[in-house]
């Protein structure tokens, strides 16, 4: 099964970029797509029109989508729910996004897969040391996420994906991966998943695909970065699809 996670960026030419993203997804061989920062239901509808190959969509909320989380799937989604993270730390605009985790059960040809799509709070200091104020916020969110993963039936495989806003080598993330019994599909990869800019020429990998095997099975994966190049919009302008790259994984279940 082929899975993608991507932060779609909530600002700047949003409808045009989402149409271009949807068209690219519709042409792809991806089976499950997990997006973050899709803030409005009208944008989820736009994606669905642009990518009709994905017959099944999971998102929560009316006008404003909870957590900005959307899952597109070629396979049936039997159930899904959104769980909001605890509100901690200073008052900040990001709280309006109601960040949390979306848990969905997808009926793949290989059997049921639990997909957890999430977007953690941003670290505005770019300091991921354990004592940083934003690291403490992330620790609370990760604790809630770990409890959600622990509650998933161990007979089911799990993929935890999204913009975790934590570098791969950060103690908060590595401790969470160990505590939750997960493995990082891109372990050891040093490439950034946030697009480098003159103001931030060497960003870290903030977007991750983490997996847990079902009891008695093995879930393995390989991954790569996608959607790194500019695209041409209908009016002729060139733009990137997002300020993040997509992370695509090929997951395989075996006994």
Task: Give the label of every model feature segment.
Residues 3-19, 89-96, 121-137:
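Acidic/histidine-rich helix-loop elements
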Residues 26, 32-122, 219-227:
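Structured beta-strand-rich core segments of catalytic domains in phosphoester-bond hydrolases
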Residues 103-116, 134-161:
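His/acidic metal-ligating clusters that form di-metal
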Residues 9, 39, 76, 119-121, ...:
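Catalytic metal-binding/acid-base residues of hydrolase active sites
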Residues 1-50, 61, 142-143, 243, ...:
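N-terminal, active-site-proximal structural segment of metallo-dependent hydrolase catalytic domains
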Residues 150-159, 166-255:
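Metal-dependent phosphoester-hydrolase catalytic domains
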């Amino acid at each position: 099964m082929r899975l993608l996670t991507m932060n779609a960026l909530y600002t700047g030419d949003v409808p045009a970029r989402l149409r271009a993203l949807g068209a690219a997804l519709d042409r792809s061989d991806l089976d499950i797509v997990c997006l973050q920062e899709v803030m409005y239901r009208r944008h989820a509808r736009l994606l669905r029109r642009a990518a009709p190959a994905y017959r099944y969509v999971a998102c929560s909320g009316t006008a404003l989508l909870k957590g900005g989380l959307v899952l597109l799937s070629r396979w049936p989604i039997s159930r899904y729910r959104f769980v909001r993270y605890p509100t901690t730390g200073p008052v900040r605009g990001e709280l309006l996004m109601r960040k949390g985790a979306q848990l969905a059960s997808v009926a793949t040809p290989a059997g049921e897969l639990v997909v957890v799509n999430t977007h953690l709070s941003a670290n505005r200091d770019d300091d991921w040391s354990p004592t940083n104020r934003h690291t403490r916020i992330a620790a609370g969110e990760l604790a809630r996420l770990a409890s959600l993963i622990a509650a998933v039936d161990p007979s089911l495989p799990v993929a935890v994906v999204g913009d975790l806003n934590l570098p791969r080598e950060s103690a908060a993330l590595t401790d969470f991966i160990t505590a939750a019994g997960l493995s990082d599909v891109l372990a050891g990869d040093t490439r950034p998943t946030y697009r480098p800019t003159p103001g931030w020429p060497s960003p870290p990998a903030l977007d991750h695909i983490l997996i847990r095997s079902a009891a008695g099975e093995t879930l393995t994966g390989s991954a790569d970065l996608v959607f790194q190049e500019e695209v041409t919009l209908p009016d002729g302008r060139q733009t990137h699809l997002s300020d993040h790259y997509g992370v695509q994984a090929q997951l395989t279940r075996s006994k």
